[in-house]
Amino acid sequence: MALKKYKPITNGRRNMTTLDFAEITKTTPEKSLLQPLPKRAGRNNQGKLTVRHHGGGHKRQYRVIDFKRNKDGIIAKVDSIQYDPNRSANIALLVYADGEKRYIIAPKGLQVGQTVESGAEADIKVGNALPLQNIPVGTVIHNIELKPGKGGQLARSAGASSQVLGKEGKYVLIRLRSGEVRMILSTCRATIGQVGNLQHELVNVGKAGRSRWKGVRPTVRGSVMNPNDHPHGGGEGRAPIGRPSPMSPWGKPTLGKKTRRGKKSSDKLIVRGRKKK
C-alpha cells in the first residue's frame, strides 16, 4: 500500500500521512470469526492501573486469527484481504475446500484468488505453512512457532520476516529481525514469505487526536512532574535527573537496563544475541 499525503490546510494535517488501503478488497469482516473485545483501559480485574497510556479509542471486535495453520492437506482459496484494527498487518480470509473459513496474517504478494495450503507436503510458495524441517535454507519466513502446535509467535507484525540459516539435528537456525540467531525445533511451523503492509512504519500520525482514536493516551515526561509523582520530578526550572541513571516511575533503573532474567532455559538456544542499535 502507498502513503497518502495531505495538503497543510490545518496544523494537524501538515505532516500527516495515511495508507491508501489499495490492497483492501473487503471492508466488512466475516461474522463467524468475530469475538467481543471489551475495553480494559490499562486496568486489571481489581480495577488497578497496570499499563499506563491506555484508554479510550474506537470500538473494536477481535478477529480470530489462525496462527497454528494446522489444517493440513486441504487447499484454501484467498477470498479477500481485510483491515484488522488489532494489529499492524492486514489479514486474509481463507475459504477451504470443505467450506471452513479462517483468517491468516496476509503476507506480502498474496492476492485474492490464489490458493494456499499447510502441511509437510505443501509447496514452497508465499502463504503456505510448513514444518521448519521442510523449508529450504535461505527461505524468508514469518509467523514462526516456538513450541510445536502452540501457534506462531515470532515475526507477525507488518513488514516482519526471518530467515532460515541452517539445520542442526533436531533444530533449525533462524535469524530474527533483531539480528538474533536462534535455534528452534524443526517440528515447529512457519509460513513462507514476509508479512505485508510494509509502509505501516512510515505513517505519520500528524496529531494527538489520531493517537486517541487508537486508544493511546498522552505520555507525560517524569521531569515535568512533582517529586512525589516521579523520581525525575521536582527542582527549579529544567533540573537534571540527579541520579546515576534514568528511573522508571517506580524507582527502577531504565533506558538501557537489561530486563531479561539472568538464567533462562532458552538461553542455550540463542546462538548469537541481537544486534546493538
Curated annotation (Swiss-Prot):
Coiled coil: none
One function term, GO molecular function aspect: rRNA binding
Domain of life of the source: Bacteria
Keyword Ribonucleoprotein: yes
Region (Disordered): 211-277
GO annotation, cellular component aspect: large ribosomal subunit
SMART domains: Ribosomal_L2, Ribosomal_L2_C
Keyword vocabulary terms for this entry: Ribonucleoprotein, Ribosomal protein, RNA-binding, rRNA-binding
Gene Ontology process terms (BP): cytoplasmic translation
Family to which this protein belongs: Belongs to the universal ribosomal protein uL2 family.
Function statement: One of the primary rRNA binding proteins. Required for association of the 30S and 50S subunits to form the 70S ribosome, for tRNA binding and peptide bond formation. It has been suggested to have peptidyltransferase activity; this is somewhat controversial. Makes several contacts with the 16S rRNA in the 70S ribosome.
PANTHER family: LARGE RIBOSOMAL SUBUNIT PROTEIN UL2M (PTHR13691:SF5), RIBOSOMAL PROTEIN L2 (PTHR13691)
Subunit note: Part of the 50S ribosomal subunit. Forms a bridge to the 30S subunit in the 70S ribosome.
Protein name, per record: Large ribosomal subunit protein uL2
Organism annotation: Staphylococcus epidermidis (strain ATCC 35984 / DSM 28319 / BCRC 17069 / CCUG 31568 / BM 3577 / RP62A)
